[in-house]
């Protein structure tokens, strides 16, 4: 039987990527980080001194340097490539983070990447996370989850992540950047950040990863058992 499609959406640092990876591994599904795709497009534009509002130029870069995914030999980490270059860590740098909302709002860039995402999800058995998976990319996904958390908590998570990576950041600056990104993502004209009408909204403030995973896994298993 073909596996179900699970859409996990939410704002920056809501825990969606961490949770989606674990859910995919538990179910034996494919995990697709759509945010990494928009980050890769932003990275390409920055590296090639391309105007971040020039959607045709960025789409051409995406065709010249196709985005692909792989895994480390020990299966510990998903790797992201543009062309033949591995960019898993560079696409997480602050310069990319602070500009990705601009690139992600470009209609042609969104169409190019959404088409690819939908193609990858056709066979089912996939967990996809992003900001418009349940509303645009997989509107007919069998399970849609929308994760939220307070700005304070999300800034704390990002702060800890950066420290672990050796990146020095100011906590208050992170809070400001996250709040600004929330505004940009939820107010853009194309695919704004919002829960699908049939999505389950889950507030992860004060809840650890295991608790969130357990909640989603139970929902998924109920659907799988009924299929």
From Swiss-Prot:
Top enzyme class, one word, equals transferase
Could you tell me what reaction this enzyme catalyses?
CMP + ATP = CDP + ADP; dCMP + ATP = dCDP + ADP
The family database entries (Gene3D superfamilies) matched by this protein are listed as: P-loop containing nucleotide triphosphate hydrolases (3.40.50.300)
Against Pfam families, the record matches this protein to: Cytidylate_kin (PF02224)
Signal sequence coordinates: none
Q: Where in the cell is it found?
A: Cytoplasm
Which InterPro entries does the UniProt entry name for this protein? Cytidylate_kin (IPR003136), Cytidylate_kinase_dom (IPR011994), P-loop_NTPase (IPR027417)
Report the record's disulfide bonds. Answer: none
GO process terms (BP): nucleobase-containing small molecule interconversion; pyrimidine nucleotide metabolic process
Q: Which coarse location class describes where this protein primarily resides?
A: cytoplasm
Provide the family line: Belongs to the cytidylate kinase family. Type 1 subfamily.
What is the official name of this protein in its record?
Cytidylate kinase
